[in-house]
Amino acid sequence: MNPFQKNESKETLFSPVSTEEMLPRPPSPPKKSPPKIFGSSYPVSIAFIVVNEFCERFSYYGMKAVLTLYFLYFLHWNEDTSTSVYHAFSSLCYFTPILGAAIADSWLGKFKTIIYLSLVYVLGHVFKSLGAIPILGGKMLHTILSLVGLSLIALGTGGIKPCVAAFGGDQFEEEHAEARTRYFSVFYLAINAGSLISTFITPMLRGDVKCFGQDCYALAFGVPGLLMVLALVVFAMGSKMYRKPPPEGNIVAQVIKCIWFALCNRFRNRSGDLPKRQHWLDWAAEKYPKHLIADVKALTRVLFLYIPLPMFWALLDQQGSRWTLQANKMNGDLGFFVLQPDQMQVLNPFLVLIFIPLFDLVIYRLISKCRINFSSLRKMAVGMILACLAFAVAALVETKINGMIHPQPASQEIFLQVLNLADGDVKVTVLGSRNNSLLVESVSSFQNTTHYSKLHLEAKSQDLHFHLKYNSLSVHNDHSVEEKNCYQLLIHQDGESISSMLVKDTGIKPANGMAAIRFINTLHKDLNISLDTDAPLSVGKDYGVSAYRTVLRGKYPAVHCETEDKVFSLDLGQLDFGTTYLFVITNITSQGLQAWKAEDIPVNKLSIAWQLPQYVLVTAAEVMFSVTGLEFSYSQAPSSMKSVLQAAWLLTVAVGNIIVLVVAQFSGLAQWAEFVLFSCLLLVVCLIFSVMAYYYVPLKSEDTREATDKQIPAVQGNMINLETKNTRL
């Protein structure tokens, strides 16, 4: 039977090759050499692209820097909802590059795609800024505007991601491949410069400027929006200087159809009646031209190498989550400068700005002079190893922190701290329901202690009997407690005798390097205490206890206090990182109020500087892996599919974020053990990647052109040539 003839069931085994598809590609017209920057190999158009990328990254990272706080304090979402939406937005930003690449390669081309999606990007910033104006509607409207804005921003930033880097690479002639390689380093430099500056500036716009009596989120979102407008204007200004390769048809659809046809054709002919073919994609030769099949082969070869890569991003992206939470339990006082926990991640773009020229101009050149073939894939493998080491160091730091962290009571346990506000020493005996002794402790008057005693209960809730011996007096008080809580027993004067009150304590270190304070008012007048931006704390008279209030670390020499008829000042002194304080207001003097200061939970002692080694390692890993990966993706992509491959590279970042969410949600491990788990997983992935890369044969510029005129070389497996020994890891 003729293989090109329909059978009785009207199923087509093979489709005839159209005359148009069999024709060779028309020769390209001679290219005009674009103007260069100061006689270098860099086209002038590159300057517009790099400035555009700097402004766009400033816009993105600046908005993202204050996004979580916006969710928490403006929309009043809880931490779980805020975290979920934040990571969902981040993942969406790395999934949409597939759409942008498809539009660029099959419809509009890279230039128009960048222009149009940048307009969508700007519109998203407009919605986001409007959603941060307090007087504009209620919470529902703010939420809708915010989610619409974030969706448009994700579409805009994700859609242009694969296009901008590849469009910059298009500006170079083939003979300037070395300059193109350096361009990707400059491009990555612009990304991190924008990230570094915006991460410093936008939190200042939010916190230091007040809008409608609160933090100015509208300004913090509006300024990044203006930077995106500037990015669009700068990019459009270079329009006449750009080389604009036209789109080469519906590439994504062609690739999918080609792969599908090859698989179906191979499956239909699995009986072996027809001769075997050198590669499974060769089964598409009856319908698709050889140059397309060769391009798809080159694409799948690189995509196969991409399979292990998400694990690297799973580690790298934890700088903004797990590592920040780790910094939250450390002391940010560096002596000459006080560093907040969420500011530590600024170290990454700062080090990138140093490491990129250091690696390009010094380290790589020294390795080259030693005649070591340090290829792109080898750099990426070394980057993975450095990331493994970074997380091993993070695990060591975490174990050190665990030795200093404030413990939490378990089931049928409570922690009890005794504070003596009486004039003399008091002996405290705590008895259980069966009069069994749970605690015997002597406490000096106004003794400053951070000591908590662990008491074992007989049930989840229980009444405890407190026997207080003061001079010759014995006082008995009963208090109810519940398991897994921390309590403070406050002993105070009651005329000639003493009494006690049991106050539930948080027992938890304040988040984000803040200090937590509360007050006990022994005066006979109600007291209002003003702590800067928040509403005054009200403390009732005669041993009234205030709620906790978190404040920034710093000195508070003159806190405003007032009763119904007088105004006073109160010196709180230095409030330190992660410390919980109790202030007992004892009396009024001519200088103001006097208070006794006690630390419930001690200061974070481990310096945040101990995170420096892990940041150095992970940043070096990023430079070797990410910068190299950008250039590798471009150089190994067929000319018709460069944006598609760039989008696939970014897609590995999205998958990496999902890995973090899954492991963090279901591992149930201690934090140090989770760090070790990630380190070991990446080490295994690195070994697999190294084996895959050993057999990888790099794509040469003439490979796909030659494929249209001669037989496709023998390649086996998943596009890994097992016959050649000309390997390049």
Swiss-Prot record:
Task: State the function annotated in the UniProt record.
Answer: Proton-coupled amino-acid transporter that transports oligopeptides of 2 to 4 amino acids with a preference for dipeptides. Transports neutral and anionic dipeptides with a proton to peptide stoichiometry of 2:1 or 3:1. In kidney, involved in the absorption of circulating di- and tripeptides from the glomerular filtrate. Can also transport beta-lactam antibiotics, such as the aminocephalosporin cefadroxil, and other antiviral and anticancer drugs. Transports the dipeptide-like aminopeptidase inhibitor bestatin. Also able to transport carnosine.
pH dependence of activity: Optimum pH is 7.5.
- This chain belongs to the protein called Solute carrier family 15 member 2
Which stretches are Cytoplasmic in the membrane topology? 1-57, 109-113, 161-183, 239-295, 365-380, 633-643, 696-729
Q: Which residues cross the membrane?
A: 58-78, 88-108, 114-134, 140-160, 184-204, 218-238, 296-316, 344-364, 381-401, 612-632, 644-664, 675-695
The record's comment about this protein's domains reads: The extracellular domain (ECD) region specifically binds trypsin.
List the glycosylation sites: N435, N448, N528, N587
UniProt effect for mutating D170A: Loss of transporter activity, at least for di-alanine. No effect on plasma membrane location
SUPFAM superfamilies linked: alpha/beta knot, MFS general substrate transporter
Which residues are annotated as modified residue Phosphoserine in the UniProt record? S9, S28
Q: Where is this region: Extracellular domain (ECD)?
A: 402-611
Q: Name one GO molecular function term.
A: peptide:proton symporter activity
Q: Which gene encodes it?
A: Slc15a2
Region described as Disordered: spans on this chain: 1-35
Annotated GO biological processes are: antibacterial innate immune response; dipeptide import across plasma membrane; dipeptide transport; metanephric proximal tubule development; oligopeptide transport; peptidoglycan transport; protein transport; regulation of nucleotide-binding domain, leucine rich repeat containing receptor signaling pathway
* Location of the protein in the cell: Apical cell membrane; Cytoplasmic vesicle, Phagosome membrane; Cell membrane
